């Protein structure tokens, strides 16, 4: 082979070797690229998978959080509902008949005008209300009078009673004509003070002295339950009885056999039985005549009547039956017109006008929070010394809730109205009395 051919062969082999090397390098590079792509693809796939898993985890967490929140809200709603039911149940348990009565009383008093409130403090005869000479029926005149002066109560006497049918109709009509609940009262003690029994020829239960002499408290209960039953059947809801006076002065004719006894404890026991008997029949009892009329010689109907007994003596005797009647639940206490200087720092003032006696002793010492009513204000023990309006104002300021039979109803009413308007008597004081009155009037409306 010539030298030229050898060189050509050498260059060909070198070119081939270079090509082989180039192809090899290219193959290596290609393999590296392919491998890198594969790795990148796997990495990308991993990243995508991780993101997807993260997203799914986030969605799942959000869903679980939402479910938890919904559950919490539902639980809260249930607890709130249960709490409301529990509160309502507690409220229902705590809302007592006493609460219902208080609410009715508050609403009744709040709904009255001042004129109506003042009229509601008076307890008068039908003649005083209407101006007629003798009232034996309740018609248009009674209706108009009650619309003008819606008095708190009307008291009837023998002259007003002709027959059972007439009495029932008169009282039923009167009650229906009154805008507000009204007291319909009478003096029915038994014995010589029995307006209804005497007028209608009913069997008289007899004087309380006879019952007291037996020492039988059940007899006092039965007699007064009998009285209460027939009074209620005609439409009466107040009896100005029992007499709680202790007859310590045998010369005291105005009380006499109207009292159960001269022994304080006997009177106290009998009074408790009498109160229970009357009020079991639905008729309010009225203890009388505070602070005690049993020791006086005078008659407050015709003039001044006075007792010289000391506070200590009265506390041990006269007050005992009143305490007993109050503890038994008497709806009313009547304050008499006797003067008791030992109770009023020597002042000779009718008890019915004395703040020391009504507020200081009856209210505060004896703890009485029921209705305090004066004895009839047309008695000489009052009228000889005071005008009707002055006496009514004094009684209310002293602590009385109701004024019984003022000498001049119109004068007394106008006087009290003016006293409230000018601040001599506060409206709060009037409201306090009306609330005590309406607690009794509305009590039976609470089941």
Positions of the model-derived regions?
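N-terminal hydrophobic targeting/anchoring segments and the immediately downstream early-domain regions
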Residues: 2-184, 188-195
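Second-shell loop/turn segments in exported
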Residues: 90-95, 105, 128-133, 153-162, ...
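Second-shell residues forming the walls of enzyme active-site clefts
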Residues: 113, 133-134, 138, 163-176, ...
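Conserved beta-strand positions in the central sheet of alpha/beta enzyme cores
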Residues: 123, 155, 239-240, 286, ...
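Short beta-strand elements of ligand-binding domains
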Residues: 181-188, 240, 428, 433
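Substrate-binding cleft of extracellular glycoside hydrolase catalytic domains
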Residues: 182-224
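A substrate-binding/cap region within the structured catalytic cores of diverse enzymes
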Residues: 206-275, 279
């Amino acid at each position: 082979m010539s030298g030229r051919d050898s060189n050509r062969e050498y260059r060909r082999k070198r070119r081939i070797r270079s090509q082989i090397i180039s192809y090899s390098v290219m193959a290596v590079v290609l393999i590296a690229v392919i491998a890198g792509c594969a790795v990148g693809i796997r990495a990308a796939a991993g990243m995508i998978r991780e993101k997807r898993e993260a997203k799914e985890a986030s969605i799942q967490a959000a869903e679980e959080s939402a479910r938890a929140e919904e559950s919490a809200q539902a639980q809260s709603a249930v607890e709130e509902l249960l709490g409301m039911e529990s509160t309502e149940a507690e409220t229902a348990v705590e809302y007592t008949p006493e609460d219902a009565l208080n609410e009715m009383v508050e609403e009744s008093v709040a709904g009255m005008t001042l004129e109506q409130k003042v009229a509601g403090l008076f307890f008068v005869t039908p003649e005083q209300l209407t101006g007629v000479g003798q009232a034996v029926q309740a018609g248009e005149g009674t209706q108009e009078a009650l619309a003008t002066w819606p008095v708190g109560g009307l008291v009837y006497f023998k002259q007003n009673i002709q027959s059972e049918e007439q009495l029932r109709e008169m009282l039923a009509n009167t009650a229906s004509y009154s805008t507000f609940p009204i007291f319909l009262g009478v003096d029915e003690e038994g014995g010589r003070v029995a307006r209804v029994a005497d007028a209608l020829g009913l069997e008289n239960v007899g004087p309380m002295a006879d019952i007291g002499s037996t020492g039988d408290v059940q007899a006092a209960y039965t007699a007064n339950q009998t009285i209460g039953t027939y009074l209620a059947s005609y439409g009466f809801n107040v009896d100005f009885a029992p007499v709680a006076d202790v007859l310590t002065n045998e010369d005291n004719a105005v009380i006499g056999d109207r009292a159960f006894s001269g022994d304080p404890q006997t009177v106290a026991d009998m009074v408790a039985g009498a109160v229970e008997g009357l009020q079991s029949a639905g008729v309010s009892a009225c203890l009388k005549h505070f602070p005690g009329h049993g020791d006086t010689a005078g008659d407050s109907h015709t003039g001044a009547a006075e007792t010289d007994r000391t506070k200590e003596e009265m506390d041990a005797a006269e007050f005992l039956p009143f305490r007993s009647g109050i503890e038994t639940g008497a709806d009313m206490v009547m304050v008499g017109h006797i003067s008791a200087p030992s109770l009023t720092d020597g002042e000779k003032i009718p008890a019915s006008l004395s703040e020391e006696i009504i507020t200081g002793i009856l209210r505060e010492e004896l703890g009485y929070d029921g209705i305090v009513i004066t004895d009839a204000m047309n008695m000489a023990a009052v009228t000889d010394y005071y005008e009707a309006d002055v006496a009514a104002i004094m009684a209310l300021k002293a602590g009385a809730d109701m004024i019984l039979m003022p000498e001049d109803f119109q004068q007394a009413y106008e006087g009290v109205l003016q006293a409230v308007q000018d601040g001599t008597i506060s409206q709060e004081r009037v409201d306090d009395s009306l609330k005590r009155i309406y607690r009794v009037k509305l009590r039976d409306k609470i089941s």
